[in-house]
A protein has these predicted regions:
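Short, charged juxtamembrane terminal tails flanking transmembrane helices
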Residues: 1-3, 141-144, 343-350
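Cytosolic-side membrane-entry/anchor segment at the start of a transmembrane helix
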Residues: 1-5, 67, 216-221
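Alpha-helical transmembrane segments and immediately adjacent membrane-interfacial amphipathic helices
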Residues: 6-29, 38-63, 73-97, 103-134, ...
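Membrane-interfacial, low-structure loops and terminal tails that flank and connect transmembrane helices
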Residues: 137-151
Length: 350
């Protein structure tokens, strides 16, 4: 990879994170209304995902340009995990007060869910510490065994366990909230948290794929399994969003319904990464360099939809939160474009 292109792909996650923080701060300063509070806090929290994606980009690009660096393999996942933990603590702090307002309740749950995603993405960074073994293993055969440089089976299983446990936590928590969906804050927070949990579940597939390909244990059975898993979760999340939008006439349905559809777009962006790694594993794919276009399209979907919603929010404040949050989700999708491009450069056979 060209060193200048490498730096560009490293900078994209940081720039997108700064945009999320800047827009979130601007929204918070604009008004004290509850819609501004929720949208501003959620936008700022999305920077944690961008930070975690930056650590992933840095680790892989550094290997492509300079080789494996054990210092980077330790430092950058720690940075990502630190950002995710701070984000989860921030979300929990909003929920820990004695008299939690509705806007704090919703924002706290969403921010905590964003922190869970950031932790899962940081696990992608941690599992990518020996990314160069993937094209090497793909050029060989399963009979070659596990390379001595690869993570042990125990460490690999621990890495996969992180998104699995966070997915279970998010699922149980969101279902608990939805059991009291007649309370509006529970209804909104429960649906959005369930969508965020779907992203964590998608990242199980990505972490498992990277770990197993690094260890040369990527089986024929799971070759396409994770692709189906991620596309299924993305589609279910989009359908959930559509269901929320059409299931009632209440204004409270607008934010969770629209945001769920765009969380499905993030799932599809993750699908592009899982699909790419499956496509180039012990085979040649001439279209591999087109796969990074998937997160570009999902990014454009989020941004164009946000622009329409911003106009609609002039007359209906129910559209205000999604019109702002979708800009941040578009930024996350564009950050995923840089990661998919890096994976394509490092693993695809030209």
């Amino acid at each position: 990879m060209n060193i200048y292109i490498g730096w560009l792909f490293k900078l994209i996650p940081l720039i997108m994170g700064l945009i999320c923080i800047a827009l979130g701060g601007f929204v918070l300063e604009s008004s004290g209304q509850s819609e501004y509070f929720v949208a501003g806090h959620v936008l700022i929290s999305l920077a944690a995902i961008c930070l975690a994606l930056f650590t992933t980009a840095f680790i892989i690009i550094s290997q492509l340009t300079r080789g494996v660096n054990t210092y980077y393999n330790t430092l950058f996942p720690i940075i990502g995990y630190a950002g995710s933990i701070i984000t989860m603590i921030w979300g929990w702090a909003l929920l820990a007060g004695n008299d939690v307002m509705a806007d704090e309740f919703v924002a706290g749950h969403v921010i905590f869910g964003v922190g869970m995603i950031a932790a899962c993405v940081s696990t992608v960074a941690a599992s990518s510490g020996h990314f160069l073994l993937i094209p090497k293993n793909a050029a060989g055969s399963k009979s070659d065994g596990t390379p001595v440089q690869a993570y042990s089976s125990l460490i690999g299983n621990c890495l996969i366990a992180v998104p699995v446990l966070l997915t279970l936590l998010g699922f149980i928590w969101s279902i608990t909230l939805l059991r009291s969906a007649d309370i509006t804050p529970h209804y909104v927070a429960g649906h959005v948290l369930l969508g965020l949990t779907a992203i964590c579940a998608c990242l199980i597939g990505l972490v498992a794929t990277i770990v197993h390909q690094t260890r040369n244990t990527f089986s024929t059975k799971e070759h396409w399994l994770w692709c189906y898993w991620v596309i299924f979760l993305g589609s279910i999340t989009v359908l959930q969003g559509i269901y929320v939008l059409v299931s009632s006439d209440a204004s409270a349905r607008l934010a969770p319904g629209i945001i769920l559809i765009c969380l499905g777009m993030i799932c599809y962006s993750i699908f592009s990464k899982v699909w790419l790694l499956a496509l180039v594993w012990r085979r040649t794919c001439s279209l591999a360099n087109r796969i990074p276009m998937i997160p570009v399209f999902t990014c454009l979907f989020c941004l164009f939809l946000a622009s329409f919603l911003a106009e609609m929010a002039q007359t209906d404040m129910g559209y205000f939160i999604p019109s702002r949050v979708l800009v941040g989700l578009g930024a996350v999708c564009f950050t995923l474009f840089s990661i998919v491009s890096i994976l394509e450069a490092g693993s695809a056979k030209k």
